[in-house]
């Protein structure tokens, strides 16, 4: 796995390219993310690094969490994430990963949680067609048939019905980095990314599905 970075979604806006065309972009606060732990084959059986993100007050973390972070000389951090790496050479505890790891024109994968919708109905959750809305119809937003009768005498598992939707982990692949603001640790990525403003994101260099990173 390639080493990525954690960030938060700030929102969407648009910028203009050299030809004057408007480009929709998402602004991401990417890092800084200090390395909080380095794992090696000798000590843990595999090579990996753990990074932290989003500084918080000490009272918001437990004593074991604070002790773990203090070993790396890191401040109290809300989120921790691990990346597998082929080698840990050149990586040090406390080393900060910042937005300048990426460059304009680079392809990235962005992982996050979609906006939660709560308990939703058939149309909103699955895109079912509604019934007639005219006078006399009693089937405006009903689901229709949920199966046969006595045989099988039950609703099959997996039947699309009303229920909780959203707040699912998803990855948007192959997004283009339009601009990098290294001074403010901002990434401008073309298109939309999962979640609402303030949502936690995992940004990694793009990989082809099935390709060994």
Swiss-Prot record:
GO molecular function: rRNA binding; structural constituent of ribosome
Hydrolase recorded as keyword: no
Top-rank taxon: Bacteria
Keyword terms, alphabetized: Ribonucleoprotein, Ribosomal protein, RNA-binding, rRNA-binding
Intrachain S-S bonds: none
Ribonucleoprotein is among the record's keywords: yes
GO cellular component term of the entry, any: cytosolic large ribosomal subunit
GO biological-process terms attached to the record: translation
One Pfam family named in its UniProt record: Ribosomal_L3
Stretches the record annotates as Disordered: 131-168
Gene3D superfamilies, A to Z: 3.30.160.810, Translation factors
Protein's job: One of the primary rRNA binding proteins, it binds directly near the 3'-end of the 23S rRNA, where it nucleates assembly of the 50S subunit.
Subunit record text: Part of the 50S ribosomal subunit. Forms a cluster with proteins L14 and L19.
UniProt-listed HAMAP family: Ribosomal_uL3_B
UniProt-recorded name of the protein: Large ribosomal subunit protein uL3
Gene name linked to the record: rplC
